[in-house]
From Swiss-Prot:
Binds 1 FMN per subunit. Belongs to the SsuE family. Isf subfamily. This is Iron-sulfur flavoprotein AF_1436. InterPro entries: Flavoprotein-like_sf, FMN_Rdtase-like_dom, ISF_SsuE-like. Its cofactor is FMN; [4Fe-4S] cluster. PANTHER family: IRON-SULFUR FLAVOPROTEIN MJ1083, NAD(P)H-DEPENDENT FMN-CONTAINING OXIDOREDUCTASE YWQN-RELATED. One of its GO terms (molecular function) is 4 iron, 4 sulfur cluster binding. Keywords: 4Fe-4S, Flavoprotein, FMN, Iron, Iron-sulfur, Metal-binding. [4Fe-4S] cluster binds at residues 47, 50, 53, 59.
Length: 220
């Protein structure tokens, strides 16, 4: 069993990192082999919007995203962690998410479980940011079992109660994996899938990899 934590903070040892460590520690205690990836330490180019990944199934860029995609694919559990920057995830996390586009169009990460960790400085709605990352996980095919929100302005300020919430998230992910928990699609999920399939049907000549994926599954 493997678990990977994706840290979207530019700070390697900040509050989001501490909370992610707490969640990963709980997964490790449950028998998972864990790994944490600090996005800012990796070379990840912006998505250029060329569409090659949708047409041919593979990105034309060669950078550290190859390694990160492999880690996610090989993991049974995935946690996304980000501080709130201007009401949303950091630029680093958004760049990572943008480069994961093929998994949103072709959700091949089914059978995995995950969740989100958000740290904020008291401004905004961190639950909405966590909800966004969990919706991203769900779009990839991963079952999001929850999230943990913490408060911190100064690095290391996040408190014991918030660290406990992160640990509980790790425990919840481990339990979901063990029980093979299934999540029924919501009305929003079904509507998003309907919109995606309409897009792919209309532009199948540009999204050949997507078209063939869904055709094989009998949706087109």
């Amino acid at each position: 069993m493997k678990a990977v934590g994706i840290l979207g903070s530019p700070r390697k040892y900040g509050n989001a990192s501490k909370m992610l460590d707490a969640a990963l520690k709980e997964l490790e205690n449950s028998g998972f082999e864990v790994e944490k990836v600090h996005i800012s330490s990796k070379k990840i180019n912006y998505c250029t919007g060329c569409g090659t990944c949708l047409a041919k199934g593979e990105c034309v860029q060669r950078d550290d995203m190859d390694e990160l995609k492999r880690l996610v694919e090989e993991s049974d559990a995935v946690i996304l962690a980000s501080p709130v920057y201007y009401l949303n995830v950091t630029a680093q996390m958004k760049t990572f998410i943008d480069r994961m586009l093929p998994y949103g169009h072709r959700p091949t990460l089914k059978g995995k479980y995950g969740g989100s960790i958000v740290v904020y400085a008291g401004v905004g709605k961190p639950e909405e940011v966590a909800g966004y990352m969990n919706r991203v996980l769900k779009a990839w095919g991963i079952v999001p079992v929850g999230y943990a929100v913490g408060f911190g302005v100064i690095p290391g300020e996040v408190g014991d109660e918030d660290l406990k919430k992160a640990s509980q998230l790790g425990s919840k992910i481990a339990e979901a994996f063990e029980s093979k928990y299934r999540m029924e699609p919501s009305d929003e999920d079904l509507e998003l899938q309907k919109q995606l399939l309409t897009l792919i049907k209309n532009y199948g000549h540009l999204m050949k990899a997507d078209y063939e994926f869904w055709k094989e599954k009998g949706f087109i």
